């Protein structure tokens, strides 16, 4: 399928799944970016809906292990989840290690087979990487994701007031709770909309949502080459 048709098809699919998870239940949203803040996600329900169209999808979570997330993903999607926490313990991740152009100390190599991952969750990742490390991570994502695979990334649009990482706990397929973890060094950068576009040149950016709590959620997919047939 030509890329323009593929992109149009995926956008049409995204519009059809907007109501896939109706009703917020008893979840109460809170404002701000403080500890325990709860926010409605625009991209997460679309990511869930995308994975529900795939039999036994394989997911990669680039954040720390959060038992509730693994349980919700497994129960909702019947999927296999790999956890690659590329920073390890953020309280020990040094500023020099994250800012250096040498990526050898980071887990950005992603030791997974080519074309093996259906979906990727990129939580509090890119804000803490140098340009070189972020680029290397994206290239490795392009290698390991299946053609048509879907990714969700969150980017902060302003610097955090204190050195911290954010753990994202999924309350349901619509809501995320923010858990703040002290970090060894301050967040070195933010990514503008233009920065994100340039970073994801290996992918097709499908939708981007600028949220009121100074975050941008982005959905992207790996292009499907002409004549490509999914593996059995």
Please describe what each predicted stretch is.
Residues 2-51, 59, 66-111, 150-232:
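Class I (Rossmann-like) S-adenosyl-L-methionine-dependent methyltransferase catalytic domain
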Residues 135-147:
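A short glycine-rich, Lys/Arg-flanked "PGG" loop and its adjoining helix->strand segment in the class I
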Residues 128, 133:
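A short His-aromatic
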Residues 120-121:
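Hydrophobic beta-strand segment of the Class I
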């Amino acid at each position: 399928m030509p890329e323009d048709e593929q992109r149009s098809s995926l956008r049409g699919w995204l519009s059809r799944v907007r109501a896939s998870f109706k009703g917020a239940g008893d979840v109460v949203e809170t404002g701000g970016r403080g500890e325990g803040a709860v926010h409605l996600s625009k991209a997460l329900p679309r990511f869930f809906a995308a994975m529900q169209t795939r039999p036994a999808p394989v997911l990669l979570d680039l954040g720390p292990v959060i038992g509730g997330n693994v349980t919700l993903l497994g129960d909702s999607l019947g999927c296999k989840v790999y956890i690659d926490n590329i920073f390890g313990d953020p309280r020990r991740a040094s500023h020099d290690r994250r800012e250096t152009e040498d990526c050898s100390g980071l887990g950005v190599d992603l030791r997974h087979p080519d074309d093996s991952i259906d979906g990727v969750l990129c939580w509090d990742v890119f804000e803490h990487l140098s340009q070189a490390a972020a680029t290397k991570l994206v290239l490795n994502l392009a290698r390991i994701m299946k053609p048509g695979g879907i990714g969700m990334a969150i980017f902060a649009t302003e610097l955090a007031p204190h050195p911290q990482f954010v753990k994202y706990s999924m309350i349901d397929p619509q809501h995320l709770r923010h858990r703040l973890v002290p970090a060894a060094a301050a967040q070195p950068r933010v990514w503008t909309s233009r920065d994100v576009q340039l970073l994801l040149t290996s992918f097709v950016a499908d939708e981007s949502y600028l949220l009121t709590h100074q975050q941008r959620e982005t959905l992207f997919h790996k292009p499907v080459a002409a004549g490509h047939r999914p593996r059995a």
